[in-house]
Amino acid sequence: MKLNPDQLLRPAQYVEKFLVTSILDGTYSTGASLPNERRLAAQLGVTRPTLREVLRRLAGEGWITIHHGKPTVVNNCWQEGGLSLLSTLSKYAAYLPNGFITHLLEVRLTMLPPVARRAADFHPKIILGFLDKARNLTENAQIYSDYDWKLQMLMARNSHNPVFSLILDDFYSIFTSMALIYFSDKKARQASRTYYRELTLAIDSSPAAVEEVVEIAMQQSISIWQEVRCRSGGSCIIDPNRNDAGGL
Protein backbone atom coordinates (compact mmCIF):
# COMPACT_ATOMS: atom_id res chain seq x y z
CA MET A 1 0.00 0.00 0.00
CA LYS A 2 1.36 3.40 -1.01
CA LEU A 3 1.37 5.91 1.83
CA ASN A 4 0.25 9.50 1.50
CA PRO A 5 3.37 11.69 1.99
CA ASP A 6 1.56 13.51 4.81
CA GLN A 7 1.35 10.21 6.72
CA LEU A 8 5.14 10.22 6.98
CA LEU A 9 5.21 13.58 8.74
CA ARG A 10 5.46 14.00 12.49
CA PRO A 11 2.34 15.61 14.03
CA ALA A 12 3.94 19.06 14.40
CA GLN A 13 5.21 18.92 10.81
CA TYR A 14 1.76 17.97 9.56
CA VAL A 15 0.13 20.84 11.45
CA GLU A 16 2.69 23.31 10.08
CA LYS A 17 2.18 22.10 6.51
CA PHE A 18 -1.59 22.29 6.80
CA LEU A 19 -1.62 25.80 8.25
CA VAL A 20 1.11 27.32 6.05
CA THR A 21 -0.21 25.88 2.80
CA SER A 22 -3.76 26.86 3.75
CA ILE A 23 -2.59 30.45 4.26
CA LEU A 24 -0.56 30.48 1.04
CA ASP A 25 -3.35 29.04 -1.11
CA GLY A 26 -5.96 31.39 0.36
CA THR A 27 -7.98 28.81 2.30
CA TYR A 28 -7.30 31.04 5.30
CA SER A 29 -7.02 34.53 3.84
CA THR A 30 -5.53 37.60 5.51
CA GLY A 31 -7.76 38.68 8.39
CA ALA A 32 -9.56 35.34 8.60
CA SER A 33 -9.99 33.58 11.92
CA LEU A 34 -8.72 30.05 12.47
CA PRO A 35 -11.05 27.48 14.05
CA ASN A 36 -10.78 27.33 17.82
CA GLU A 37 -8.04 25.19 19.30
CA ARG A 38 -10.24 22.23 20.25
CA ARG A 39 -11.93 22.07 16.85
CA LEU A 40 -8.72 22.52 14.85
CA ALA A 41 -6.86 19.87 16.87
CA ALA A 42 -9.71 17.41 16.29
CA GLN A 43 -9.83 18.28 12.58
CA LEU A 44 -6.11 17.59 12.20
CA GLY A 45 -6.04 14.57 14.50
CA VAL A 46 -3.37 15.97 16.81
CA THR A 47 -3.19 16.84 20.49
CA ARG A 48 -3.91 20.36 21.61
CA PRO A 49 -0.38 20.81 23.06
CA THR A 50 1.09 19.91 19.64
CA LEU A 51 -1.21 22.36 17.90
CA ARG A 52 -0.47 25.05 20.48
CA GLU A 53 3.29 24.61 19.99
CA VAL A 54 3.02 25.10 16.21
CA LEU A 55 0.66 28.06 16.56
CA ARG A 56 3.09 29.82 18.90
CA ARG A 57 5.97 29.29 16.48
CA LEU A 58 3.99 30.51 13.47
CA ALA A 59 2.89 33.53 15.48
CA GLY A 60 6.54 34.29 16.23
CA GLU A 61 7.31 34.23 12.51
CA GLY A 62 4.42 36.56 11.70
CA TRP A 63 1.96 34.16 10.05
CA ILE A 64 -0.77 34.62 12.64
CA THR A 65 -1.68 36.65 15.70
CA ILE A 66 -2.89 34.81 18.78
CA HIS A 67 -5.50 36.65 20.83
CA HIS A 68 -6.13 35.00 24.19
CA GLY A 69 -9.83 34.46 24.63
CA LYS A 70 -10.45 35.44 21.00
CA PRO A 71 -9.94 33.69 17.64
CA THR A 72 -6.44 33.44 16.19
CA VAL A 73 -6.22 35.73 13.14
CA VAL A 74 -4.25 35.23 9.92
CA ASN A 75 -1.77 38.04 9.24
CA ASN A 76 -0.60 39.49 5.95
CA CYS A 77 2.63 37.50 6.20
CA TRP A 78 4.28 39.47 3.37
CA GLN A 79 4.04 42.65 5.43
CA GLU A 80 4.18 41.36 9.00
CA GLY A 81 6.55 38.40 8.71
CA GLY A 82 10.22 38.41 9.66
CA LEU A 83 13.32 36.75 8.22
CA SER A 84 12.54 33.52 10.07
CA LEU A 85 9.42 33.24 7.92
CA LEU A 86 11.68 32.62 4.90
CA SER A 87 12.92 29.34 6.36
CA THR A 88 9.37 28.08 6.69
CA LEU A 89 8.37 29.39 3.26
CA SER A 90 11.29 27.56 1.69
CA LYS A 91 9.71 24.20 2.59
CA TYR A 92 6.64 24.95 0.49
CA ALA A 93 8.02 26.33 -2.77
CA ALA A 94 5.16 24.77 -4.76
CA TYR A 95 2.68 27.03 -2.95
CA LEU A 96 4.54 30.31 -3.44
CA PRO A 97 2.70 33.03 -5.38
CA ASN A 98 3.66 33.97 -8.93
CA GLY A 99 6.60 36.33 -8.98
CA PHE A 100 7.93 35.42 -5.54
CA ILE A 101 11.10 33.81 -6.92
CA THR A 102 11.73 36.94 -9.00
CA HIS A 103 11.42 39.03 -5.84
CA LEU A 104 13.98 36.82 -4.11
CA LEU A 105 16.34 37.17 -7.06
CA GLU A 106 15.92 40.94 -6.88
CA VAL A 107 16.96 40.83 -3.22
CA ARG A 108 20.00 38.81 -4.23
CA LEU A 109 20.76 41.35 -6.97
CA THR A 110 20.99 44.02 -4.27
CA MET A 111 22.95 41.92 -1.78
CA LEU A 112 25.38 39.68 -3.65
CA PRO A 113 27.47 42.16 -5.72
CA PRO A 114 28.92 43.99 -2.67
CA VAL A 115 29.30 40.63 -0.89
CA ALA A 116 31.33 39.30 -3.83
CA ARG A 117 33.44 42.44 -3.87
CA ARG A 118 34.28 42.07 -0.18
CA ALA A 119 35.13 38.38 -0.60
CA ALA A 120 37.35 39.09 -3.60
CA ASP A 121 39.06 41.87 -1.66
CA PHE A 122 39.66 39.82 1.50
CA HIS A 123 40.20 36.31 0.10
CA PRO A 124 40.75 36.35 -3.68
CA LYS A 125 42.73 33.09 -3.71
CA ILE A 126 39.91 31.18 -2.03
CA ILE A 127 37.32 32.40 -4.54
CA LEU A 128 39.65 31.84 -7.50
CA GLY A 129 40.41 28.32 -6.30
CA PHE A 130 36.73 27.48 -6.32
CA LEU A 131 36.09 29.16 -9.67
CA ASP A 132 38.84 27.02 -11.18
CA LYS A 133 36.61 23.99 -10.56
CA ALA A 134 33.99 25.40 -12.95
CA ARG A 135 36.04 24.06 -15.86
CA ASN A 136 35.11 20.53 -14.81
CA LEU A 137 31.34 21.04 -14.59
CA THR A 138 29.35 18.51 -16.61
CA GLU A 139 26.08 19.27 -18.38
CA ASN A 140 23.88 18.35 -15.45
CA ALA A 141 21.33 20.59 -13.72
CA GLN A 142 22.02 19.16 -10.26
CA ILE A 143 25.77 19.68 -10.60
CA TYR A 144 25.32 23.28 -11.72
CA SER A 145 22.81 23.94 -8.96
CA ASP A 146 25.17 22.61 -6.28
CA TYR A 147 28.15 24.51 -7.65
CA ASP A 148 26.34 27.82 -8.03
CA TRP A 149 24.95 27.64 -4.51
CA LYS A 150 28.35 26.79 -3.03
CA LEU A 151 29.92 29.72 -4.88
CA GLN A 152 27.40 32.16 -3.41
CA MET A 153 27.85 30.81 0.09
CA LEU A 154 31.64 30.83 -0.27
CA MET A 155 31.55 34.52 -1.17
CA ALA A 156 29.18 35.28 1.71
CA ARG A 157 31.31 33.40 4.25
CA ASN A 158 34.48 35.15 3.09
CA SER A 159 32.96 38.65 3.16
CA HIS A 160 33.94 39.18 6.83
CA ASN A 161 30.28 39.79 7.68
CA PRO A 162 28.50 36.69 9.05
CA VAL A 163 25.06 38.26 8.60
CA PHE A 164 25.34 37.85 4.82
CA SER A 165 25.68 34.07 5.04
CA LEU A 166 22.86 33.85 7.61
CA ILE A 167 20.50 35.70 5.28
CA LEU A 168 21.56 33.81 2.18
CA ASP A 169 21.28 30.45 3.93
CA ASP A 170 17.57 31.10 4.50
CA PHE A 171 17.15 30.91 0.72
CA TYR A 172 18.70 27.44 0.47
CA SER A 173 15.61 25.25 0.00
CA ILE A 174 13.89 27.66 -2.37
CA PHE A 175 17.07 28.20 -4.36
CA THR A 176 17.83 24.51 -4.80
CA SER A 177 14.30 23.70 -5.94
CA MET A 178 14.18 26.48 -8.54
CA ALA A 179 17.82 26.03 -9.59
CA LEU A 180 17.06 22.55 -10.91
CA ILE A 181 14.46 24.11 -13.22
CA TYR A 182 16.79 26.94 -14.19
CA PHE A 183 19.84 24.80 -14.91
CA SER A 184 17.85 22.22 -16.86
CA ASP A 185 17.98 24.84 -19.63
CA LYS A 186 21.10 24.64 -21.81
CA LYS A 187 21.24 28.41 -22.34
CA ALA A 188 21.19 28.96 -18.58
CA ARG A 189 24.17 26.64 -18.11
CA GLN A 190 26.05 28.39 -20.92
CA ALA A 191 25.30 31.76 -19.33
CA SER A 192 26.65 30.57 -16.00
CA ARG A 193 29.85 29.29 -17.55
CA THR A 194 30.35 32.74 -19.06
CA TYR A 195 29.68 34.32 -15.67
CA TYR A 196 32.25 32.13 -13.92
CA ARG A 197 34.91 32.98 -16.53
CA GLU A 198 34.18 36.71 -16.32
CA LEU A 199 34.23 36.60 -12.53
CA THR A 200 37.64 34.94 -12.59
CA LEU A 201 39.01 37.69 -14.83
CA ALA A 202 37.40 40.38 -12.67
CA ILE A 203 39.02 39.08 -9.48
CA ASP A 204 42.39 39.31 -11.20
CA SER A 205 41.50 42.89 -12.18
CA SER A 206 39.94 44.67 -9.17
CA PRO A 207 37.24 44.36 -6.49
CA ALA A 208 35.20 47.02 -8.31
CA ALA A 209 35.22 44.89 -11.45
CA VAL A 210 33.97 41.94 -9.41
CA GLU A 211 30.99 43.91 -8.15
CA GLU A 212 30.11 45.00 -11.68
CA VAL A 213 30.35 41.48 -13.13
CA VAL A 214 28.20 39.99 -10.37
CA GLU A 215 25.60 42.75 -10.63
CA ILE A 216 25.25 42.24 -14.38
CA ALA A 217 25.06 38.47 -13.98
CA MET A 218 22.43 38.65 -11.23
CA GLN A 219 20.28 40.99 -13.32
CA GLN A 220 20.59 38.69 -16.31
CA SER A 221 19.71 35.65 -14.22
CA ILE A 222 16.35 37.26 -13.40
CA SER A 223 15.56 37.62 -17.10
CA ILE A 224 16.73 34.09 -17.87
CA TRP A 225 14.66 32.70 -15.00
CA GLN A 226 11.56 34.45 -16.34
CA GLU A 227 12.20 33.02 -19.80
CA VAL A 228 12.70 29.51 -18.43
CA ARG A 229 9.52 29.78 -16.37
CA CYS A 230 7.63 31.03 -19.42
CA ARG A 231 8.69 28.02 -21.46
CA SER A 232 7.76 25.66 -18.63
CA GLY A 233 4.27 27.10 -18.35
CA GLY A 234 4.82 29.80 -15.71
CA SER A 235 4.38 33.55 -15.98
CA CYS A 236 5.94 35.18 -19.07
CA ILE A 237 7.71 38.47 -18.35
CA ILE A 238 10.83 38.60 -20.51
CA ASP A 239 13.34 41.43 -20.79
CA PRO A 240 14.14 41.79 -24.51
CA ASN A 241 17.29 43.82 -23.74
CA ARG A 242 19.15 41.19 -21.73
CA ASN A 243 22.35 39.41 -22.72
CA ASP A 244 22.59 35.65 -22.28
CA ALA A 245 25.11 35.61 -19.45
CA GLY A 246 24.49 35.07 -15.80
CA GLY A 247 24.46 32.57 -12.98
CA LEU A 248 21.41 31.80 -10.94
Annotate the PLM regions.
Residues R56, A116-A120, A156-H160, L180, ...:
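Amphipathic alpha-helical interaction elements
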Residues Q7-L8, Y14, R52, R56, ...:
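Juxtamembrane/interface motifs at transmembrane-helix termini
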Residues M1-T110:
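Short linear motifs at protein or domain termini
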Residues Q79-L154, T194-I216:
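All-alpha effector-binding/dimerization core of bacterial HTH-type transcriptional repressors
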Residues F18-S22, T110, P114, K133, ...:
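Solvent-exposed, charged/polar functional surfaces in cytosolic regulatory/catalytic domains
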Residues R135-N136, Q152, D169-L248:
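C-terminal all-alpha effector/ligand-binding and dimerization domain
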Residues R157-H160, F164-D170:
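Long, low-complexity, charge-rich intrinsically disordered regions
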Residues N36-E37, H160-P162, S205-S206:
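Short loop-to-helix capping motifs
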